[in-house]
Design a protein with these regions (language model features):
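Membrane-embedded alpha-helical segments that form the functional core of polytopic membrane enzymes
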Residues: 31, 37-65, 129-135, 139, ...
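Small-residue-rich segments of transmembrane alpha-helices in multi-pass membrane proteins
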Residues: 23-32, 154-169, 187, 216-220, ...
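Intramembrane alpha-helical segments
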Residues: 87-175
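Functional transmembrane core segments of multi-pass inner-membrane proteins
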Residues: 156-203, 209, 221-225
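Multi-pass membrane catalytic core of lipid/isoprenoid biosynthesis enzymes
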Residues: 80-120, 215-247, 286-292
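Acidic (Asp/Glu-rich) catalytic motifs at the cytosolic membrane interface
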Residues: 57-82, 193-215
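Extended hydrophobic alpha-helices typical of membrane-associated regions
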Residues: 243-302
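Topogenic membrane-insertion module of multi-pass membrane proteins
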Residues: 1-46, 50, 54, 146-156
Length: 304
């Protein structure tokens, strides 16, 4: 009865946006900016900031619309939340905020679209390629992509890797580049894995909510194997890019997080069915996603 009269606070209004997770955008935009800086020797920092705003709004839109959808399907009501999975719980505490979640999600998507239009006008139609892919991913992720196992797996990586890194590099560097494509493989694999590991504690709730991810279709063990392959893919892509001279040698700074990746892979196999024991791996997984693109970006900036 008491919860019914408690008014939403600032943390509740920020809750549907999943603000702590928005730090990931900074890492990915920094990586795209690093690619452009390494290629050109300078970048327009105003455009870099605008690209960051667009990226943050795109991510916030997905988060808020996902909370809206999970409230209606009941997914978040059936999950046992961890700091990294199960939704924010905002709409369960304040059901009247459901309209706000939808509104802020659509508003953030509109801001992203407006920034995208600006860059198309300023930089040319080629930017539309990643722009359209990004908007499609944002729009379809919760209602459609989460019900198709392979697309659900790779959609986060496409959004943060292909769209965010290559898009930032293109608007700051003037065109797409092989350097950005190679660099984008790091967040492609790691961010796909971020969402994959976060799905481990939510398998049963996602199943009853109509979702169909790789864990539901193929099981926890197969999910842990895919997670490990994707972790390896992120680091192997950097090594290959340096060997064939697409990226400079200092890009190997990204390999500093390999020991952390080994720990999370072991955790996925050993603790995949135990929510409490998996929590340390979930936290380390977030750290890997934040640090690895930043280390790679640092290597690119220092190589100029």
């Amino acid at each position: 009865m008491l919860s019914a009269v408690i008014k939403p606070g600032i943390n509740d209004y920020l809750g549907t946006l999943r603000v702590p997770f928005l730090l990931l955008n900074l890492s990915c935009v920094a990586l795209g900016a690093g690619c452009a800086f390494w290629r050109r020797g300078s970048i327009d920092w105003t455009d870099a900031l605008l690209a960051l705003v667009g990226a943050v709004c795109a991510h916030a839109s997905v988060n808020s619309l996902n909370e809206y959808s999970d409230f209606h399907t009941g997914v978040d009501s059936r999950t046992i939340r961890t700091p990294f999975s199960g939704g924010s719980g905002t709409l369960q505490r304040h059901p009247a905020m459901v309209g706000y979640a939808l509104g802020i999600g659509l508003t953030c998507a509109a801001v992203t679209a407006a920034i995208g239009i600006y860059f198309v006008v300023a930089c040319g139609w080629r930017i539309l390629l990643v722009g359209i892919l990004g908007l499609v991913t944002v729009s379809l992720y919760t209602p459609w992509l989460t019900r198709r196992p392979f697309l659900c797996l790779v959609a986060p990586g496409l959004g943060f890797g292909t769209c965010m890194v290559m898009g930032t590099d293109a608007v700051l560097g003037g065109d797409y580049s092989m350097a950005a494509f190679a660099a984008s493989m790091v967040p492609f694999f790691l961010v796909s894995n971020l969402l994959l590991l976060n799905q481990f504690p939510d398998v049963e709730a996602d199943r009853t909510g109509g979702r169909k991810n790789v864990l539901i279709v193929h099981g926890i063990r197969a999910g842990a194997a895919i997670y490990t392959l994707f972790q390896a893919g992120a680091y192997i892509s950097v090594i290959v890019a340096v060997v064939v001279r697409i990226l400079p040698p200092l890009s190997l700074l990204a390999l500093l997080t390999v020991p952390l990746a080994v720990r999370t892979s072991i955790g996925a196999f050993r603790d995949g069915t135990d929510r409490d024991k998996l929590k340390p791996a979930l936290g380390i997984n977030v750290l890997i996603n934040l640090l690895t693109p930043l280390l790679l970006a640092s290597g690119l900036f220092l190589s100029r």
